[in-house]
Amino acid sequence: KFLLFKTVLIKNFCHGAFFHNLSYLFLNRKNTPLEKLLWRIVSDGSERFDTHFDLAVSYIEGGSAYYVHDHVSAAKKAAFIHVDYVQAGYTRRLDKDCYVDFDRIFAVSDETAGVFAGVYPECQQKLSVFHNLIDTEAIRQKALLPAEKSMHEGIRLLTVGRLTPQKGFDCAVYALKLLLEKQYPVYWYIIGEGPE
């Protein structure tokens, strides 16, 4: 948590957003989960680009959507919603109504689209369902098969992702070190590709 907090502070000071976000955090702290507020603040402190794009896509709700909305210049903007919007703790106030300005919004299921449309009814015309391209049933079936390699006993953690600095694997290494120092029998498996 300290490393994340330190990163948030540095980024917000670099982009001059610290004092603006401090008041935002203070005003919204009672009605919004802290992790949601931190994503709003992190998006305001993130790197900015002078490039104008034809299309900008926020592939996940929260900080990604806030960043694309507030800090990316693009002719068209699209957003994906992967979660039950209300259950996940998002609100229009937290979003600062950013989804109203997106040109297209894609939900990953009919249920997800329905919940989102309940919060943003005026976005109904630009809201579509775009199912995940992953065959979840095939994954469930493969999970039942015996492992090809023997796995360590104890707590097994699996991380799947692109191995780049932006993904923050360096932070995860510190977390793993803390678990090992506390004598937890933890084994961390990483699947991915990239420069790290």
Region spans (language model):
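Nucleotide-sugar donor-binding and catalytic loop/hinge architecture
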Residues: 141-156, 180-181
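Carbohydrate-associated surface elements
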Residues: 111, 133
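An amphipathic, basic-hydrophobic alpha-helix
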Residues: 6, 17-52, 93
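A conserved mid-protein helix/loop that constitutes part of the nucleotide-sugar donor-binding site
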Residues: 155, 159-178, 195-196
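Glycosyltransferase donor-sugar binding loop
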Residues: 134, 160, 187-196
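Active-site proximal beta-strand in glycosyltransferases
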Residues: 55-61, 66-85
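Nucleotide-sugar donor phosphate/pyrophosphate-binding loop at the beta->alpha transition
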Residues: 35-45, 65, 82-101
